[in-house]
Design a protein with these regions (language model features):
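C-terminal ends and interior cores of transmembrane alpha-helices
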Residues: 125-138
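Intracellular juxtamembrane helix-capping segments at the cytosolic ends
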Residues: 157-172
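Helix-to-loop junctions at the C-terminal end of transmembrane segments
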Residues: 101-115
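Pair of pore-lining "gating" transmembrane helices in MFS-fold secondary transporters
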Residues: 41-62, 150
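Short amphipathic helix-loop junctions that connect adjacent transmembrane helices
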Residues: 64-87
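C-terminal membrane-cytosol helix-exit motif in multi-pass small-molecule transporters
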Residues: 3-20
């Protein structure tokens, strides 16, 4: 709370940065960033955005239902007192730890493999993540859950960063920020 208050006071010392409005009149379509949807006319971008949306849906399902899924094993006597059931949140939080650490790998991966291969690694990591999560159990298969949570970092970070760079590379400067927004909407 003190740090937040300190940052609030600091923000009042920053210089005034007026927004450059430009001389041209913008249409409602431009103001709302809807021109980014024109990217769906390009096959490569349409496939990318549809895949991103499907990945985003899968991500939201696993994020939203991971805890109830793990906790549901308490109805099976052999799993009721296992670590994965008793500490589902701790197990799931390994994903965030992995995500935090894997973001440090991105510069290395992009330099050595390039955007397309990093994106392919991310896609394979998503398959591995969902497969391990679906096949694991909180007893003898808890290692699959743990590995699934670790792989999540590579899957999430590599796809989101390489995807953002891909959108940046493939779009015109005039709609780039709208295209980035569309990418975020599709993946989240």
């Amino acid at each position: 709370a003190c740090f937040g208050l300190l940052l609030a006071v600091y923000s009042f010392t920053l210089p005034n940065c007026p927004v450059n409005k430009g001389n041209e009149k913008k249409s409602l379509v431009d103001a709302m960033g809807l021109r980014a949807f024109l990217l769906f006319k390009r096959k490569k971008m349409a496939i990318f955005f549809v895949f991103s949306m499907l990945l985003g849906v899968s991500l939201q399902i696993t994020n939203g239902f991971a805890n109830p899924f793990l906790s549901s094993f308490d109805k099976i006597p052999e799993y009721a007192n296992t670590f994965g059931v008793q500490h589902a949140n701790a197990l799931i939080s390994l994903s965030q730890v992995s995500e935090t650490l894997c973001i440090l790998l991105i510069p290395f991966a992009l330099k050595h493999f390039g955007i397309k291969r990093v994106m392919l690694i991310a896609m394979l990591a998503w398959v591995l993540r969902f497969g391990l999560f679906g096949l694991g159990n909180p007893g003898s298969g808890v290692w699959m859950f743990v590995l699934s949570m670790i792989v999540y970092g590579v899957a999430f970070d590599f796809f989101n960063i390489s995807g953002s760079l891909f959108v940046n590379k493939e779009t015109d400067l005039a709609i780039r920020s709208s295209a980035q927004g569309l990418f975020v909407i599709m993946t989240n």
